[in-house]
C-alpha cells in the first residue's frame, strides 16, 4: 500500500524542490462501474500524475491519503491504494488504486477522494491539482461513443453480452465494424425474441428493444 501523508515524518527529510500533481484540474474525477466489467470483483484505476521539477535517476514513491470528509469509501474494504512510483528518468507516473466490488454497491455508490501527500521525495502538490475523486458503483451509465440509437440499461447490457465491449464504441471499431456489429446485434435480438415467444426483449421502461 502506498505511504499516506505524515507531515511530521516529512519534516525530517531534506528534499529537493520537486513535487507532483494530478495532470488536469479540469478532469479530476472518474466513475468506475462494475456493471461494465461482468464477473470481476476488483478493478484497477490508474490516475496519471506529473512531476513538477527535474527527473531523477532513481524511482520515487507517490504518497496519497483519503480525504475523509469528502469520502464514504472505507480503506481496505472498498479500496486499497497500491504502491506507486514516478519511475527513474521519468516525469510521468500513475497513482494505482484497487477498488473492490462489495454488496453495498447494489444500493449506493462509494465515493473516494484522494489527496497527494508530501514525502521524502516530493513537496506538497499545488492545491488545485492535489485532489482526485473516484466514484465506484454497480450501475450502467450512458457510455462514451454510444451508437445504438435510443439508450437503455437493458439494451446496454445486451450489447455488452454480445460484443464484450462496454464503452467507447466509436474509438474501438471502424465504420465497417460498427455496421457489422449492428447487424450481429439485430440477429441476436431476433434469436432472443424467437426463443421468448410472447415476451420480447424490453427495456426497464417496458419499451421494446430495437437496433
Model region roles, listed by residue range:
Residues 77-79, 85:
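A glycine-rich, hydrophobic loop/mini-helix early in the fold
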Residues 6-61, 68-76, 94, 102-111, ...:
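Intrinsically disordered, low-complexity regulatory regions in eukaryotic proteins
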Residues 84-93:
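Short proline/glycine- and polar residue-rich coil/turn motifs
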